[in-house]
Amino acid sequence: MTAVSQKTTTPSANFSLFRIAFAVFLTYMTVGLPLPVIPLFVHHELGYSNTMVGIAVGIQFFATVLTRGYAGRLADQYGAKRSALQGMLACGLAGAAWLLAALLPVSAPVKFALLIVGRLILGFGESQLLTGTLTWGLGLVGPTRSGKVMSWNGMAIYGALAAGAPLGLLIHSHFGFAALAGTTMVLPLLAWAFNGTVRKVPAYTGERPSLWSVVGLIWKPGLGLALQGVGFAVIGTFISLYFVSNGWTMAGFTLTAFGGAFVLMRILFGWMPDRFGGVKVAVVSLLVETAGLLLLWLAPTAWIALVGAALTGAGCSLIFPALGVEVVKRVPAQVRGTALGGYAAFQDISYGVTGPLAGMLATSYGYPSVFLAGAISAVVGILVTILSFRRG
């Protein structure tokens, strides 16, 4: 065993882990603040279709997928801290691209192109940020606390979504898209300053298997994660348009309900994957997610939709750490960054594919249909998880 694998959690390590997670919260506001606003900006201000809305939201995740391998190698070979800080700076640059889209006196296609550039930069930054912070956290507290590391980072991410969605709509409605873009440009720089003095963890040495051999070890939990991700993708992409189409207010608070329930589950039950193993926790979580998405599909009122969003958030909450525990068990220490990056890439692919496909579904069958599609995906995720791990 390496020295790192023998580490136990100390107060100083916990405080460093908190600082990393808080910096993730600040940086991930670059995702949370614009998430409910971009569909409105693309559809209402630029005049594009639901499919183009899906592309504008989903393309970020394709950029994340394509750079996960680079982020994992960067964290494994040159240090997780470098990966995380580099990701924060890239997320700040995304806000600069959106600021240009808001301020330049150019045509709608050019504004849309600048928006897409910002989304691509954000995807590049997100892959480095999350892969770096997960690997950094594991180096600080040790792999036996992998569920804790993933839970704290997840709380930061979805806390940023919960706080960012209504705040983003508020900033946009009162001050416009330029103010929103400027805010997203500044927050990652604050996160970078907050994390600058957290100690490095050494890069691992040893033989490094190829990326494809690592994927061969993690594809089963990755597939379960991808099927879970459809639910969040349809909420993040179409919930604001769903509410507007029904004449409901409080669209931003659906992501608050989702993110709040997500964080609460992590706080109360984030220890479960380390204690009981990932598979049982993942199956129960997918059942809860299914119930929430079915409520959103059938919701007669805004309040029922909010309950559905909260249930979906509660269901999604523990799936990443639950199946992530299985990933950490399967790979050697020197490729944990690559493995975690590849694992998260399954979710990114899900987010990226879901956006445009759900956009076509919404155009043909209405916005409720996308939530039914999410529920069906979660049910398939239950079956895949049970069958894969029973055979594995």
Swiss-Prot record:
<feature type="transmembrane region" description="Helical">
    <location>
        <begin position="46"/>
        <end position="66"/>
    </location>
</feature>
<dbReference type="Pfam" id="PF07690">
    <property type="entry name" value="MFS_1"/>
</dbReference>
<feature type="transmembrane region" description="Helical">
    <location>
        <begin position="174"/>
        <end position="194"/>
    </location>
</feature>
<feature type="transmembrane region" description="Helical">
    <location>
        <begin position="369"/>
        <end position="389"/>
    </location>
</feature>
<feature type="transmembrane region" description="Helical">
    <location>
        <begin position="276"/>
        <end position="298"/>
    </location>
</feature>
<feature type="transmembrane region" description="Helical">
    <location>
        <begin position="151"/>
        <end position="171"/>
    </location>
</feature>
<keyword id="KW-1003">Cell membrane</keyword>
<feature type="transmembrane region" description="Helical">
    <location>
        <begin position="22"/>
        <end position="42"/>
    </location>
</feature>
<dbReference type="InterPro" id="IPR011701">
    <property type="entry name" value="MFS"/>
</dbReference>
<comment type="similarity">
    <text>Belongs to the major facilitator superfamily. YfcJ family.</text>
</comment>
<feature type="transmembrane region" description="Helical">
    <location>
        <begin position="342"/>
        <end position="362"/>
    </location>
</feature>
<dbReference type="GO" id="GO:0005886">
    <property type="term" value="C:plasma membrane"/>
</dbReference>
<feature type="transmembrane region" description="Helical">
    <location>
        <begin position="97"/>
        <end position="117"/>
    </location>
</feature>
<dbReference type="InterPro" id="IPR050171">
    <property type="entry name" value="MFS_Transporters"/>
</dbReference>
<feature type="transmembrane region" description="Helical">
    <location>
        <begin position="224"/>
        <end position="244"/>
    </location>
</feature>
<feature type="transmembrane region" description="Helical">
    <location>
        <begin position="121"/>
        <end position="141"/>
    </location>
</feature>
<dbReference type="InterPro" id="IPR020846">
    <property type="entry name" value="MFS_dom"/>
</dbReference>
<dbReference type="InterPro" id="IPR036259">
    <property type="entry name" value="MFS_trans_sf"/>
</dbReference>
<dbReference type="InterPro" id="IPR037541">
    <property type="entry name" value="MFS_YfcJ"/>
</dbReference>
<keyword id="KW-0812">Transmembrane</keyword>
<protein>
    <recommendedName>
        <fullName>Uncharacterized MFS-type transporter YfcJ</fullName>
    </recommendedName>
</protein>
<keyword id="KW-0997">Cell inner membrane</keyword>
<keyword id="KW-1133">Transmembrane helix</keyword>
<feature type="transmembrane region" description="Helical">
    <location>
        <begin position="252"/>
        <end position="272"/>
    </location>
</feature>
<keyword id="KW-0472">Membrane</keyword>
<keyword id="KW-0813">Transport</keyword>
<dbReference type="GO" id="GO:0022857">
    <property type="term" value="F:transmembrane transporter activity"/>
</dbReference>
